[in-house]
Structure formats: structure tokens, C-alpha cells
Amino acid sequence: MESLTLQPISKINGQINLPGSKSVSNRALLLAALASGTTKLTNLLDSDDIRHMLNALKALGVEYKLSANKTECEVTGLGRAFEPNEALELFLGNAGTAMRPLAAALCLGQGEFVLTGEPRMKERPIGHLVTALKAAGADVEYLENENYPPLKIKGTGLHGGTVEIDGSISSQFLTAFLMAAPLSTQETTIKIVGDLVSKPYIDITLDIMATFGVKIENQNYQTFVVPANQTYVAPGDFLVEGDASSASYFLAAAAIKGGEVKVTGIGKKSIQGDVQFADALAAMGTEIEWGDDYVIARKGELNAIDMDFNHIPDAAMTIATAALFAKGTTSIRNVYNWRVKETDRLAAMATELRKVGAVVEEGEDYITITPPASLQHASIDTYDDHRMAMCFSLVALSDTPVTINDPGCTSKTFPDYFDKLKELSC
């Protein structure tokens, strides 16, 4: 297995122009494909998850032109649901932002489809979405284990009506259903069961859907009413925001070691909830400055925090490694859905934090971290999880090197992450 040893980083300073958001990129690509007209996306993320979506759309008959650097994409929309001439098997890697929304969208048109992916994808639940789709008339079956991919889908259209979706495991189930619902033949009423996790990700979905011209009534995130027989309309130009989750590593690096780091592509006007990560850093003692399309972090004296991170679970992972540099015991609460991400992130994070010397308590939906007097050199296993690799790179901001196993797993969302980190540390 390939590994990368990061030597201690003595200073952090500079500016990072963020790659496009994974969440925004894949949502916008799918809606551009379904829309009438042509959409030109700029600052598209070039990564594995986006590549899986693009490959699937091409197989489904969508025409697009991708720039040489793969960050601009002109999509010619179908103006309707997908209706390929032959049965298709679509391999979606470990891309939840492709698997869940495509599973819903493929129910709308005609054709037979198998959706599959990497072994870890077959361990990531999809049952709550499938149950809701079936209630709206979909023909979906599990090919291996109940409630998990791979799926076999027969396009029959969705007839709307009232459906329930459990919101407590993943917001992607609701996102997927919301994006399909406007093309249903009757009005759809979606009722949320349980507490809705990662609510800011639903805001991303609603914002992009509005940009593509459809109407939804949001009743306090408990009920969503979606009129039937709508058409997505291409907005023309669509700028993909920088990835706020990716910003977290650089902002945290400044907080730990600063210097001053400015990240551009997100700011106080961002539609991504993960920009609130900067507020968590501020609560720890970091100096934060906001602009419309940038955030600046400057070093502060970091103190432990005890906080509910249900709304920003991805960025919360960065707090777990920043906690190694804070005074006191940090508690990250209400993050059960870490367990159903690219890996079981609660178990993985606890295991790897202990390797560098931290005292860790892992609960069903929380983790507490007490830093050691000095960090230990360790080989960090990344579990084929991009965020594990990026989070633990921050250990090098101490006086101790850190070895990252399988650093290439960052290709899921940020292929040149380690190059960018090096630029800031020169």
C-alpha cells in the first residue's frame, strides 16, 4: 500500500482557491441532465464521485462537453426523464451523491437499470429511500441484501401522493426524493419521520432546484409539498461554489499553526451549511473574518468545545483532529450518521486518534477527545475514506511527523489536497 509521511510543518500561510463542492456538483449535473436547455457549469469538481455521475449520465444518453481541466461542463439537457434504449448497469463507486439521487431519478422514466458500486457502497443503507419510492409507485428490488445496493430499477414513473421518509440516518434520501418529485404525475407530499440530520444539505438541494425553475413548499422541514408535472429549466450559467467541507482543513491549519489562511469560493453568502465550521473554530478561539466569497482564519489560543454537530457532520471530523491542539476535552455530539458514511467514521476516528496518543471515548453517536502532552508518530489507516486522510494530515502541524496510508483516497473529492497543503506550508 502506498503511504505518505508528512514531516512537521513549521508555518502555515497563504490563500486557497477551493475546488468545487461535491454536493453541489452532482446535484447540478443531474438537474442539468433532466432540464430543458443547456447548462454551463463552471468550477465543477474534478474527482472520482463526479466522474461516476458523468459516466452514468453519458450511458443514459446525456450529451455534455467537458473542458480539458474537467472543471467546466456544458450539459445539453434532455428536458424529460431518462429513457435509454437498452438495459443498463451503472457502476457508481462509493458515491452516495450519485447512487441515491440516480436511484430516484431512474424511477421517473422508462428502462431497466442495475445500480451498483464498490464493496463499501453495498454496506451503505438505502432502504428508507427505496421504501418511499415504492410508496410513490416505483418498481425497485434489492439484488443482494435487503435495504442496501445493488438495486434493480424498472422505470415506471412516479405517481406522487403522500410518502414518509425517515430523516434520521441520511439527508441524501430526502434530497434524492425531492429532486425526482417535480416530475411525478401527481402532487407529492413528503412527511419527515424522526429528526432530520444534516439539514443544511437539504437547503443546498432546495436552492439548486429553485435555480432550475421548480417550486416546492417547505413546511418547517417537517413536510414538503411538490407540485406535479413540473419541468426543470436550464439556468444557462451555473457557478459551483467551492467545497466548504474541503475548506475546513485549511482553516483549521491556520487556527492550529497560523499565520493566516484565506479560502475563496465560499463565504457568508454560501448555500453550504459546512461554512458553519468556521463558527465552531471561532468558538474554540480562532479569529475568523468573513467576506461574501471568502473566509479568513488566524491563529488563536485553542480551547476545547462541547458541541452538537448534527448539522455539519462532514466538517465536524476536522474538529476531531483540531482537538488534538486544544486545551481540555472536546466533545463532538449527535453524529450517529458518521457510522454510515464512506466508513464507520466514529470507530475509525477513535482508533486513529488513539494511535497518536489521545484519550478517546467513543459512544453510539458521540466522541470525546483529550489531547496528549505531545503527539506520537503513527501510521494512520484511512479506510478508503478521503476525509480521514485529510483530517489526519493536520497532525503534522505538531512537532511530530505523521504517515498517511493510502493518501490517494483523497481523489474522491480533492485529488491534489496534499499539494495544496504543501503550498501553504512553504
UniProtKB/Swiss-Prot annotation:
Catalyzes the transfer of the enolpyruvyl moiety of phosphoenolpyruvate (PEP) to the 5-hydroxyl of shikimate-3-phosphate (S3P) to produce enolpyruvyl shikimate-3-phosphate and inorganic phosphate. It is found in: Cytoplasm. Phosphoenolpyruvate binds at K22, G96, R124, Q172, R345, R387, K412. The gene is aroA. SUPFAM superfamilies: EPT/RTPC-like. Its EC number is 2.5.1.19. Belongs to the EPSP synthase family. The active site is at D314. It comes from Aliivibrio fischeri (strain ATCC 700601 / ES114). This is 3-phosphoshikimate 1-carboxyvinyltransferase. GO terms for cellular component: cytoplasm. It comes from the Bacteria. Gene3D superfamilies: Enolpyruvate transferase domain. Keywords: Amino-acid biosynthesis, Aromatic amino acid biosynthesis, Cytoplasm, Transferase.
